[in-house]
Amino acid sequence: MSDTSTLPLRVLFCCGVTQNFFDLPREQIGEVWQAYGKMLAAIESMEGVKVLGIMDDDRLTVGHADNSPWTFYIMADVRNFDTTVAVCNLYRTTPVGEYNLWRYGKIEARVGRALQVPPQHANAA
């Protein structure tokens, strides 16, 4: 098995919108989406972050879902814990008008490692 001290963290960033987003008048929603676009671009350009994919799951759940409060997910390999914190901090620093993105959304990071099947079990029939 690989030396886990040199491997990046495998992070699932769970992102959602809050009731403040749904309470906005239609003409103001676009400004929030533009902020999300800027935040996603900032994540993809961060040193120490390799975005593996972004999944949007609101095709079958429209609006706020209490049992699944997330709207989209970002799977990324991240250099270290501090870089993971910096990604989450973008919600505090990305402007949306006179506020910041965290007024309209939320983020949670699930940190782990890439799953690897031990070599002795990889080819077992």
Predicted features and spans:
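Short S/T/G/P-rich N-terminal loop/turn motif that feeds into the first structured element of a domain
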Residues: 1-70, 78-82, 112-125
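Conserved, mostly hydrophobic/aromatic
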Residues: 74
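Hydrophobic side chains in well-ordered alpha-helices
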Residues: 86-87
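A common structural junction motif
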Residues: 91-102
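A short, structured active-site edge motif that brings together acidic residues
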Residues: 102-111
